């Protein structure tokens, strides 16, 4: 979402679709709980984040993708699986990273 973003460094924002099929793409985020793990990989390293917050914001509030000094992930999707102006934002803090294995 930003040219300068890097996994494991600063704010790493990702956006995905929220479909009517609740188990696809970012649909399951509506049920995520604080403390849940988010795992992403660049196939060199795996990054584990712990969910710290879940909020609904306006689609116009783009500040959530801005760089921060925290090592965090920001997941963004529509708050409903229909046309909506709300965005579900899930934030997590980096808790670990390690070499990727197949």
Swiss-Prot record:
The record marks 87 as: Transition state stabilizer. The keyword Protease applies. The active site is at 17 (proton donor/acceptor), 78 (acyl-thioester intermediate). It is an enzyme of class 3 (hydrolase). It comes from the Bacteria. Induction: Preferentially expressed in the late stationary phase. Seems not to play a major role if any as a sortase. Belongs to the bacterial sortase family. This is Putative sortase YwpE. It comes from Bacillus subtilis (strain 168). The lineage of its organism: Bacteria, Bacillati, Bacillota, Bacilli, Bacillales.
């Amino acid at each position: 979402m930003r040219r300068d973003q890097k996994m494991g460094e600063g704010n790493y924002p990702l956006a995905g679709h929220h479909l009517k099929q609740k188990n696809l793409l970012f649909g399951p985020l509506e049920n995520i709980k604080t403390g849940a793990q988010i795992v992403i990989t660049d196939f060199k390293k795996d990054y584990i984040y712990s969910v710290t917050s879940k909020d609904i914001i306006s689609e116009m509030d783009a500040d959530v993708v801005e760089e921060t000094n925290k090592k965090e992930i920001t997941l963004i999707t529509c708050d409903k699986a229909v046309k909506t102006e709300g965005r579900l934002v899930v934030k997590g803090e980096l808790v670990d990273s390690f070499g990727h294995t197949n």
